Design a protein with these regions (language model features):
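Short amphipathic alpha-helical coupling elements at transmembrane boundaries
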Residues: 8, 12, 30-34, 74-78, ...
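Membrane-water interface segments at the C-terminal ends of transmembrane alpha-helices
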Residues: 11, 77-129, 152-158
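Short, hydrophobic secondary-structure boundary micro-motifs
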Residues: 3-4, 19-22, 88-89, 104-106, ...
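Hydrophobic alpha-helical membrane segments of integral membrane proteins
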Residues: 69-72, 89
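Alpha-helical transmembrane segments of integral membrane proteins
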Residues: 36-69, 85, 117-208
Length: 208
């Protein structure tokens, strides 16, 4: 009966007995455990890429307001909001596969990791495992294979952060205390990065 199946299903969910997947030919819980590390590692890297790129671009766009640099960054952010991420990923994959020797279809180079210089994968976080093994080539290889997908995942977030940071900076740079700082003879860099940027980052950090 349906209600018995449903109760059995709920019991399995609670006890992490999620059955067997014929797609990957292993237990679902084991498949999730293996892939969760890869997903989390990629998500963290994408977050780092988005923040490290978008905040400086947003600040730079605000101090170059209505100039060609500002227009270029705003156009870049607009594309990030408008372009479907899956299409952008396919485009980059096609471009790098066709015009470079950058192999990005796997998490790592199997020849390096499994044949020429295998290391023990304990956590399935490849960056952490390569650091634990003290192997710089493995770390570089894992990072190289993650940069492109991390950039794709970060692009949409970058667009939002850039626009938010730019708007916050423009608001802050128009405040009275900024004009007072300028009247005291502080340089543009001091005004922007010491007085303006920290206050403009508060709403941005809240969003993150």
């Amino acid at each position: 009966p349906i209600h018995i199946q449903y109760v059995t299903y709920l019991r399995g969910v609670i006890t992490f007995d999620w059955g067997y997947s014929e797609v990957v030919n292993e237990e679902v819980s084991e498949a999730l455990r293996y892939r969760f590390a890869a997903t989390l590692e990629l998500s963290i890297l994408a977050f780092v890429v988005a923040v490290a790129t978008a905040i400086p671009l947003g600040i730079f766009s605000s101090i170059r307001q209505n100039r060609w640099e500002d227009h270029g960054i705003r156009l870049f952010a607009l594309f990030g909001s408008a372009i479907p991420i899956f299409w952008f990923a396919l485009f980059l994959q096609y471009f790098f596969t066709l015009y470079t020797d950058w192999q990005i279809s796997l998490r790592y180079d199997p020849i390096l990791w499994e044949i020429t210089d295998p290391i023990e994968i304990k956590t399935n976080f490849l960056l952490i495992d390569s650091i634990a093994a003290g192997s710089w080539p493995h770390f570089i290889d894992a990072l190289k294979h993650m940069i492109l997908p991390a950039t794709v995942l970060a692009y949409g977030s970058m667009a939002t952060i850039i626009r938010l940071m730019r708007g916050n900076m423009l608001d802050v740079l128009g405040q009275d205390y900024i004009r007072t700082a300028k009247s005291k003879g502080l340089s543009e860099n001091q005004v922007t990065y010491k007085h303006g940027a920290p206050n403009a980052m508060i709403p941005t950090v809240t969003l993150l």
